[in-house]
Amino acid sequence: MHRPIAPERGDLTPGSVLVSTIVGITLATGGFAIGLGTTGIAEGSTSFWYLSRASGFVAYVLLWGSVVWGLLLSTGTGRRWVRPPQLLDAHQFLSTAAVGFASFHGLVLMGDRYVSFPLRAIVVPFASSYEPLLVACGQIALWLSMLLIGSFHLRRHLSGQAWRRLHYASFVAFWMAFVHGLALGSESATLWATVVSLGTAAPVIFLSLHRVFSTQRIHGLLVGGAATRQPA
């Protein structure tokens, strides 16, 4: 009797399909934008600018969701309603989708002949001639997010301490994206943008403080328990 063949590690998984799809769509969009921009077909059109703004907003919301989901997972708060494996899947999905939309957000500007963002100005921090510091906040946030996505596949090779330290970068990425969108977004002064900014920042601050205080409380209990076990 033949034994059933176990799936190999190289087989497709939902996560790899998602990553491949997002990367493919992003690259195709970038190429399409470059083609329209260089041929002059879209000259005078503001479509690229609107697409960039919309996708940037979606990327920010997805990144926020990823950070919140990660905090719910690390603090144990979300385990009351959702099982940890599902929380982790949602966290990874939101992170990957955020990178896809953020890449689209930058690459689509290559087709806008009015703004004129070459590839180097999009992918290299501080290389932009337009607001280099604020643009770099978004670029660094994207690179950090890509690093975190890569860490999902390397988790088995990392220690718990290294994994936690690496994921502190997610907070840096979120707040840099927050500053990038708030400072450069043309809608930042509107009421709805203010509501979104405060509505996304507040949960991250609250859950971050909850995590810090919970960690300190657990550490104090462990230290206190160890002290009581010491012989007199």
How would you describe each model-predicted region?
Residues 1-232:
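Membrane-embedded alpha-helical bundles that constitute the cytochrome b-like, heme-associated redox core
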